């Protein structure tokens, strides 16, 4: 077992020293999650690496189902399904639950067409040999990591039989902070993965990436802002279409 500690100032390293079977890679510098991932993958020698989050629960067959997908040599990454636990009818829980059902369906359809577009950190796996070191300031490490594998010519398989169950955001404020981080990470990803915007090189993957991700993170916010004044102008114009049955 290997533990990666990143700038921890508690007694983690001291306590782990009592277990000789545990390897501890400690860095006193706070490099962040991506830096820790880079260090961890530097010592991993298994052909497949499965990623998950500490706050998620996997179904019992999850790992076996994910590994089975790699029987196809064209698959370089496998994305599991994220499910939101205890979703109600109001607030952050309902909003997040609906979004992930929609997102999961898109991934399933993308997979049927050619390749899923990215993986969520709650559950995904990669071929170790295809991992590329990420820049330490990468915000969406799971998405960028998986798309860099797709850029090498491998498919991202979607496995709905393997799922990770996660509790929803506590409130709309927490959900708002998470969405802001994803939005910022999305813009960063579009720039850093700009080579995927070449339709002549990436073909179907280009279409999937642009329609599913790039437009959502770049054009959609602009369109939403433009819709407000356009709707106000339409309202004030008294256009008969507003009152048509």
Language model segments and positions:
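Short, conserved alpha-helix that lines the donor NDP-sugar binding/gating region
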Residues: 13-17, 33-42, 146-147
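A conserved acidic beta->alpha catalytic loop
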Residues: 5-13, 29, 56
